[in-house]
Amino acid sequence: MAQTQLPHDAKAGPTKPEVRAVVRSKLALTDDDHFVEVGSCTGAVTIAAARDAGRVTALERKADRLETTRKNLAANGLADAVELRNAEAPAELPADADALFIGGSRNYDAVLDHAAETGVDRIVMNVSRLEVAGAATQAFRDRDILTEVVQFQVSHGYELAGATSFDSENPVYMLVGSASGDTEADR
């Protein structure tokens, strides 16, 4: 698997590599899939998806962040692999997405409405704030699209006085859903 290069930064920062690995696993993208990301920021998730999915669309409302995505795609040899849209979701969301990643909490209710209406098969939303995690979980449930809630935290080891200690990242709440089949209520 190719390493993702992110030489261009955005103030919000990229989705961490370990978190991207779990996102990739939950999305299970194939060559036949149309993947859509809402809130591409640095393009870290978009880059990973462009290596797996047959078609990729990334939306970003901030022009400077979209340019960061564009530059990072180019740095990874994927400049022509992604359709970039400078838009605030749900505007300009395609109606034929197979998989959707929501990287931010802005307008997620409207984005989830769109996903439910268009039958998106795989939906993943990452949340870092507890209050938003609770509200977003309820939003998934209200639309009967929740399949799983995962909370995890990554810690990296560092040397301390000749031994190994750990520095923890903020926890991530990952909501996984589907508007086309098996949901939490079905299990």
From Swiss-Prot:
**Could you say which EC number(s) this protein's record lists?**
2.1.1.196
What the entry lists under SUPFAM superfamilies is as follows: S-adenosyl-L-methionine-dependent methyltransferases
Q: Which GO terms describe its biological process?
A: anaerobic cobalamin biosynthetic process; methylation
Reaction it catalyzes: Co-precorrin-6B + S-adenosyl-L-methionine = Co-precorrin-7 + S-adenosyl-L-homocysteine + CO2
Q: Spell out where the chain crosses the membrane.
A: none
Cross-referenced InterPro entries: CbiT, Cbl_synth_MTase_CbiT, Cobalamin_biosynth_MTase, SAM-dependent_MTases_sf
List, in alphabetical order, the Gene Ontology terms for molecular function in this entry.
Answer: cobalt-precorrin-6B C5-methyltransferase activity; protein methyltransferase activity
Alphabetically list the UniProt keywords: Cobalamin biosynthesis, Methyltransferase, S-adenosyl-L-methionine, Transferase
Sequence positions that bind S-adenosyl-L-methionine: T15, G39, S40, C41, T42, G43, E60, A89
Q: Report the pathway entry.
A: Cofactor biosynthesis; adenosylcobalamin biosynthesis; cob(II)yrinate a,c-diamide from sirohydrochlorin (anaerobic route): step 8/10
State the source organism's domain of life.
Archaea
Protein family according to the UniProt entry: Belongs to the methyltransferase superfamily. Archaeal-type CbiT family.
**What HAMAP family is this protein classified in?**
CbiT
Name-wise, this protein is: Probable cobalt-precorrin-6B C(15)-methyltransferase (decarboxylating)
**What is the originating organism of this protein?**
Halobacterium salinarum (strain ATCC 700922 / JCM 11081 / NRC-1)
